Amino acid sequence: MRCFKATIAYDGAYFLGYAKQPNKLGVQDKIENALNTLGIKSVVVAAGRTDKGVHANNQVLSFHAPKHWNVAKLFYYLAPKLAPHIVLKKLEEKNFHARFDAQKRAYRYLLTKNLKTPFLAPYIACGDYGSLDLLNSALKQFTGKHDFSLFKKEGGATTNPNRIIFNAFAYTAFIMGHECVVFKIIGDAFLRSSVRLIIQTCVQYSLEKITLAEIEMQIHNIKATIRTPIMADGLYLHRVYY
């Protein structure tokens, strides 16, 4: 068997998350079904398991295929089976594990105060976000190693809630005809819905609805103030570092 590394982009609006679903509407379902039609039966491992509605610019996968499949041949037959909502950007033969070998994962979140068209609603979140300076003041609180037990969706199981945030910041950009604030958060890994809870917390602070002290108490597992994540629209798994 050969091990392949695939880099894909997908539109999360058409899936119920990356992981396999009972109704077969996960990204993993679509890819494994496509491979099955080619006679390839393999579990497809992803660098990050995105939630329902979350997109990916550069999700990385690993899977195995029989030796008679080379890169060019597999790309030729697989890419059309994934289109249009999944794009196979790159395929290479590489002996690695997409999840366990990943060192960092970067997420981006796009938020605008005024969405001009409903057709972009799944791709740019809409809502007030207050001040850029206040957003960055809040984001700084999350850098470093922390126990993120109070920054994960209830029911999200994990054996180790400790994660490292290497960098977290926000900036403004003009994207798809909209003035947006762009959040970028880079960490070693993330708990379920953790990125969205972090961003929601920062937005609520920027809108002066919570204090830095309350953020610190939640980071230190003293008291949870924000338990509802921000909407999934506008969140992208942007890059995986190896």
Curated annotation (Swiss-Prot):
It catalyses: uridine(38/39/40) in tRNA = pseudouridine(38/39/40) in tRNA. It comes from the Bacteria. Keywords: Isomerase, tRNA processing. This is tRNA pseudouridine synthase A. The lineage of its organism: Bacteria, Pseudomonadati, Campylobacterota, Epsilonproteobacteria, Campylobacterales. It is an enzyme of class 5 (isomerase). The active site is at D51. The gene is truA. Formation of pseudouridine at positions 38, 39 and 40 in the anticodon stem and loop of transfer RNAs. The keyword Phosphoprotein does not apply. It comes from Helicobacter pylori (strain HPAG1). Homodimer.
